From Swiss-Prot:
Belongs to the thymidylate kinase family. One of its GO terms (biological process) is dTDP biosynthetic process. It holds the Pfam family Thymidylate_kin. Pathway: Pyrimidine metabolism; dTTP biosynthesis. It catalyses: dTMP + ATP = dTDP + ADP. The keyword Kinase applies. It comes from the Viruses. Keywords: ATP-binding, Early protein, Kinase, Nucleotide biosynthesis, Nucleotide-binding, Transferase. GO terms for molecular function: ATP binding; dTMP kinase activity; nucleoside diphosphate kinase activity. Homodimer; the dimer arrangement is orthogonal and not antiparallel as in human enzyme. It comes from Monkeypox virus. This is Thymidylate kinase. Its EC number is 2.7.4.9. NCBIfam families: DTMP_kinase.
Length: 204
C-alpha cells in the first residue's frame, strides 16, 4: 500500500487557505483524505494559544513560539500514522507559519526551525499569494491581524521558499477563483499520485 501525501497550505492571514483546503476535501474521495488545521485550539496548548490570539492573555514571545510548536508536536504521531496508512492529509498551516511569525517578531530563524526539526516533512507546500485587497483585509480582532506585521511575515516566508529544501508551489493572487481552484486541485492530485518513499523528517 502506498502512503498518503502530506500537503500543507500556507499564506498570510485571510489569503484563502481554509477555502482552498475545503475545495480539495470536496474533490477527493473522503476515505482517502483528512483535513487538519493549526493551531488546534481544542487541546491544552491550543486553548492557551486561543487566549493569546484573542487578546485574553499575554505571554512573552518565546513562550508563544513554544506553544505553537508544542501544538504541532501533539499531532506528529497522528500525522505519521495517517500517512503510513495511506491517508493523505490536507493541512491548513504548519511549521512554516510558526517560523515565519516567530522570525517576523525578531526570533532567530535557525532557533525557530530547530523547535520544528523532526516533524513529518510535507511532500508539498502550497503558498497562496495575497493581493492588495487581501492584505488590506488583515485588520481584525486577533493579535496578528495587522497589515504591517503581515508584510514582515511575508518576507520571512520568502526566505524559506528561496532555501529550496522544501517543494513549494506558489499560487498567484491574480488568478480568478475558479481557475485557482482547478489549478490547485490538479497540483494536489498529482502530488498524491507521485508520492514515493517513507515520510521524511522536516529540517533534519
Amino acid at each position: 500500500m502506498s502512503r498518503g501525501a502530506l500537503i500543507v497550505f500556507e499564506g498570510l492571514d485571510k489569503s484563502g487557505k481554509t477555502t482552498q483546503c475545503m475545495n480539495i476535501m470536496e474533490s477527493i474521495p473522503a476515505n482517502t483524505i483528512k483535513y487538519l488545521n493549526f493551531p488546534q485550539r481544542s487541546t491544552v496548548t491550543g486553548k492557551m494559544i486561543d487566549d493569546y490570539l484573542t487578546r485574553k492573555k499575554t505571554y512573552n514571545d518565546h513562550i508563544v513560539n513554544l506553544l505553537f510548536c508544542a501544538n504541532r508536536w501533539e499531532f506528529a504521531s497522528f500525522i505519521q500514522e495517517q500517512l503510513e496508512q495511506g491517508i493523505t492529509l490536507i493541512v491548513d498551516r504548519y511549521a512554516f507559519s510558526g517560523v515565519a511569525y516567530a522570525t517576523a517578531k525578531g526570533a532567530s530563524m535557525t532557533l525557530s526551525k530547530s523547535y520544528e526539526s523532526g516533524l513529518p516533512k510535507p511532500d508539498l507546500v502550497i503558498f497562496l499569494e495575497s493581493g492588495s485587497k487581501e492584505i488590506n483585509r488583515n485588520i481584525g480582532e486577533e493579535i496578528y491581524e495587522d497589515v504591517e506585521f503581515q508584510q514582515k511575515v511575508l518576507q520571512e516566508y520568502k526566505k524559506m521558499i528561496e532555501e529550496g529544501d522544501i517543494h513549494w508551489q506558489i499560487i498567484s493572487s491574480e488568478f480568478e477563483e475558479d481557475v485557482k481552484k482547478e489549478l490547485i486541485k490538479n497540483i494536489v492530485i498529482e502530488a498524491i499520485h507521485t508520492v514515493t518513499g517513507p515520510v521524511g523528517q522536516l529540517w533534519m
